[in-house]
Amino acid sequence: MAQRVQLTATVSENQLGQRLDQALAEMFPDYSRSRIKEWILDQRVLVNGKVCDKPKEKVLGGEQVAINAEIEEEARFEPQDIPLDIVYEDEDIIIINKPRDLVVHPGAGNPDGTVLNALLHYYPPIADVPRAGIVHRLDKDTTGLMVVAKTVPAQTRLVESLQRREITREYEAVAIGHMTAGGTVDEPISRHPTKRTHMAVHPMGKPAVTHYRIMEHFRVHTRLRLRLETGRTHQIRVHMAHITHPLVGDPVYGGRPRPPKGASEAFISTLRKFDRQALHATMLRLYHPISGIEMEWHAPIPQDMVELIEVMRADFEEHKDEVDWL
């Protein structure tokens, strides 16, 4: 059942020169800018009695604005008592350190048991924020830092910051193969043409940029630090596979685990049982959506990646004399 929304207000003189969608988002902070933009495009907004369907239209101040729209009720998700590792929290945002095996948002095959369900239980008022305040996602088996908005204004500003590339997200990963130097992958990404749950580099895809640098070399693997400029689905995993260095353990874009010649049983066992992509969101930096203060958080790599790196490091030290690239 749809909820009717009827709003009226006068544009402030202080908003002179702002885009219409920006001005309305400030005037009606209970509604996200993306929702207001949809209403404008759907011709649900009157400015001085006339329909305005251009979100980029500049306001002069003093205009009379009326909105007559409907909101379809979002699917009701159940609060669930799922533990959350809270790294930081204030009245506007929550920073969580997501574990493996936890989906961020309910969807096909995962109707519940997600970060969203956990947030609804942890902080019930977040039900009034679209998508329970979730601003960006991590894959089910990618671990690490995420920001969640506790209010609509905080979410609106975080989404805008993400679009302006003002939020910095850095990851640690272990890739297959010996990489000689860092670099940048600037390749567009879209849905795979035949495998609809997969993503792929495609010339008609959306722009995607990943920067990477080498942290540590092993015999036939490389530990990396990566930074996202964009945030496409599976971006790091797709980009690294594209340059023939897929992530260790990646069940979709990786290959079979191939331990180096002469590897110990501990190495082989650890590699074979590592059943997720070796990827962790280790650093998050952003400007606080309300105060504007720059803030930064770090999350150490989880134990499974620690063990993986330790056996690779021990193997490298044992066979250093056999490595031909030193």
UniProtKB/Swiss-Prot annotation:
Catalytic reaction annotation: uridine(1911/1915/1917) in 23S rRNA = pseudouridine(1911/1915/1917) in 23S rRNA
Any one cellular-component term (Gene Ontology): cytosol
Start and end residues of each S4 RNA-binding domain: 18-91
UniProt-annotated location(s): Cytoplasm
Keyword field: Cytoplasm, Isomerase, Ribosome biogenesis, RNA-binding, rRNA processing, rRNA-binding
Disruption of the gene: reported phenotype: Severe growth inhibition, makes only very small colonies. No longer synthesizes pseudouridine at positions 199, 1915 and 1917 in 23S rRNA. In this strain a miniTn10(cam) insertion has occurred; the first 196 residues are present followed by 12 extra residues before a premature stop codon.
A Pfam family hit: S4
Active-site residue list: D139
EC numbers for this chain: 5.4.99.23
Biological process, per Gene Ontology: enzyme-directed rRNA pseudouridine synthesis; ribosomal large subunit assembly
Gene3D superfamilies: 6.10.140.230, Pseudouridine synthase, RNA-binding S4 domain
Keyword Metal-binding applies: no
Resulting phenotype, D139 to N/T: Loss of activity
UniProt-listed CDD domains: PseudoU_synth_RluA_like, S4
SMART domains listed in its UniProt record: S4 (SM00363)
GO molecular function: 23S rRNA pseudouridine(1911/1915/1917) synthase activity; pseudouridine synthase activity; rRNA binding; rRNA pseudouridine synthase activity
Family of this protein: Belongs to the pseudouridine synthase RluA family.
Functional summary from the UniProt entry: Responsible for synthesis of pseudouridine from uracil at positions 1911, 1915 and 1917 in 23S ribosomal RNA. Other positions are not modified. Uridine isomerization occurs as a late step during the assembly of the large ribosomal subunit. Member of a network of 50S ribosomal subunit biogenesis factors (ObgE, RluD, RsfS and DarP(YjgA)) which assembles along the 30S-50S interface, allowing 23S rRNA modification and preventing incorrect 23S rRNA structures from forming.
NCBIfam families: PRK11180.1, rluA_subfam
Oligomeric and partner information: In late stage pre-50S ribosomal subunit interacts with ObgE and DarP(YjgA).
Stated name of the protein: Ribosomal large subunit pseudouridine synthase D
Organism for this UniProt entry: Escherichia coli (strain K12)
Source species taxonomy: Bacteria, Pseudomonadati, Pseudomonadota, Gammaproteobacteria, Enterobacterales
Gene it is expressed from: rluD
